[in-house]
Amino acid sequence: MERYYQKEIECASQEQIKAWQDERLVRQVRHVWDKVPYYRAKMEEKGVTPEDIHGRDDLYKLPFLSKADLRDAYPFGLLAEPLEKCVRIHSTSGTTGKRVVAFYTKEDIDLWNDCCARALAAAGAGPEDVCQVAYGYGLFTGGFGLNGGSQKLGCLTLPM
C-alpha cells in the first residue's frame, strides 16, 4: 500500500528538491546574517556575505561552527529569533564543558514533527499502527520528534 504524509514533498522530482534546497539556503543565510551577530561575524571573517550565496554549490563558502563555537555562544549567542518566540530548549549535559543548547520555536517543532512523520510514513506507518518511541525524552530531540511525527500520522504512540 502506498502511504504518504506530504505527498507533494515525498514525490517531488530531484530538480524540485534541489530548487527548494537552493531557495531555502539563500533565505536561511540571509536570516542568520540579519539575526545572529555571532554567525555574521564568522561570515565576515571569511569575507562572505549573503549576496555570495546562491544555492548548494556555494556551501563551501560558508563558515562551519565547531562545538567550541557553540559553547562560546552559550547560552543565547546563536538565537535567530527573539527568546519569547521559543517554546522549547534542548541541551547537552555539559559533561565536557559548557552545555550546548538549542532553542526551538513552534515552527521548528512543527517542521521536525513533519519530517519525522514523512519518515514514518515512508516506512509504512499509519493510523492503524502503534508506534513505540524508544528514544529518550530527555535532552535529545529524537524522542520528541518521533512522538510528534507518529501523532501527526494518527498512530497510537507509546513513549518509552
Place the predicted regions along the sequence by residue.
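AMP-binding/adenylate-forming
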Residues: 106-118, 130-160
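Nucleotide 5′-phosphate-binding alpha/beta core
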Residues: 1-91, 96-114, 118-122, 126-128
